[in-house]
Amino acid sequence: MKVRRNIDLKNQKISVEWISFIKPIGKSPRSRKSVAGEHFSKDFYRQDLKNGLISSYTRFKPVTDCMFITAEPGSFIYTSKTDDDEVCGIFFLAGPDQKVEINFLTFDIPCEHRGLISVVDGWELNGEVFPSEMDHRLPLKQRSSEFCGKNIGAKRSFTSSQNAAVIRYRIPKPGKGFTLFAKFLKNPRPCNVLAASVDEPYTLRNYGRRINCTYVALYPGTVHVIALGVGVSNFLGATRTTETGTLRKCDESSPHDQVIIGGSDGLDTSKVQIVDSICGIDSKPDYRELVEYGVTSVRLVSSGFYENSVTVQVQPLKNELLDANLSI
């Protein structure tokens, strides 16, 4: 299923292509409505909260779909209206140079009714998480937090490592739910980025670090390399000024500093099918590559000896072009 959402993020129109559902634990997701506030018990919105954050629920945006995607910060509310035990999710997508901070203001999740909330540092698709374990400083087990119970007044906070975060929840008890406040924070050195725009170029950088960083788009795409600088200057400041042009098949000649272009059917970057790998210094590369997979990825591999960067634009592959290539 393809879902297109046009989102206004800080006055910038962002077109996002989503091509697959999240695969939840248990039953398959389906759209459902919730009613904000009216089913909550009275003490859920007690007026004696000293922080003054819950003076009124009218300013909270209701979570209305089982798969709720937003590129906007703000206050959100979810209230269960059925005893259905399906797992649903709230998916936050910030700008490429931002992180997501999630603050649970109140929650009433009955553990005795198998209620549960899980916050994931990353984006989840079909049971796989981006960034994958090989590209993140923490193992997957340490990137998620689960809890249930009841808490009024004291906040519970989580901050993502990149511009994507997911809340998974199962609340099979009518009238129960949660409120939260999401903020988008500046990320001074973004590494792994989920594409939020099909039009805007993005520059992956290693900032001199020994690190692997990946730019992922959730659609088959045409990767246009706008600028390439892999091996420009080392950590001592020595600079190459001679352009080499775009060198190809660098996974064989220069595996420690390269750009891997590929695709996969999921978000696990260890399963990416490599279409090409490039390196070198090229200020005006004439390079485009088609990636005919559901997920398009551009991965910058860095040894830490160079200030590496690559600027790319990943545009959705047109259906007629995709069909023509698949028929060859």
State the predicted function of each range.
Residues 1-328:
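Domain-level representation of secreted and single-pass membrane ectodomains enriched
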